[in-house]
Amino acid sequence: MASKKAQTEVYLEVGQKKIFAGALDWPGWCRSARDEETALATLIEYAPRYARIFSRTTIDCVPPDDPAAFAVVERLAGNSTTDFGAPDVAPARDAEPFDEAERERSEAFLTAIWRAFDRAVEAAEGKELRKGPRGGGRERDGIVRHVLGADAAYLRRVGQKFSQDEAAPLDDEVQRTREAIRAALGAGARGEIPHQGPRGGALWTPRYFVRRVAWHTVDHLWEIEDRIV
């Protein structure tokens, strides 16, 4: 994504009610809509916000400003989770080997995303978060706990024995969870994540693990930013 003229490869996850468009090489840059055209347009709409995540890093993120710059290289059949509002199908790219170089790249991406998330959480301290039309919506710390809970579930999907400690101080739990994610990336680079769990269920690949952690954190980072009154 170093040049706006270069095409950005994206994949589409097509459910019955929702379609997700995701940038293959840019974990966390993934948005949904009810049809393919709008999903791609929404991905472009969020491109500047995604790029800002890396503004304080050495990651060169210059996103395109026109859906014509996208190359749709894969279409995946979605499922009920897709329609519920979360991407849930791994693109073929995520089955590629996960070596030490990819571990370093993935950790750099996640670290930048975590720091941006932390800045949003800090900006929301003492602020009211706008409620939904029916009065719903988690408060700031509830959003953080929700992200941590999802991370714990994702860790188990790559064979890590990890559970969220809801009684622990929030800051401590954030650090513990992120260290576990870093450890999982190391295990992935060493080839220690099996294809199946002990009971036979398929585990995620390390690349897809990174994609899901990034998407979910970015999604709630933007939720916090959008809901600050």
Report each predicted region and the residues it spans.
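Short, charged, surface-exposed hinge/linker loops at domain edges
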Residues: 2-6, 48-102
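Short, contiguous alpha-helical
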Residues: 9-10, 15-36, 40-59, 107, ...
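Short, flexible segments with low predicted structural confidence
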Residues: 10-12, 81, 88-89, 114-115, ...
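Generic secondary-structure boundary/loop-capping signal
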Residues: 67-70, 126, 190
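Short acidic-aromatic active-site loops that bind/stabilize oxyanions
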Residues: 103-110
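Amphipathic alpha-helical packing segments from all-alpha helical-bundle domains
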Residues: 112-120, 174-183
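Catalytic cores of extracellular degradative/oxidative enzymes
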Residues: 175-200, 204
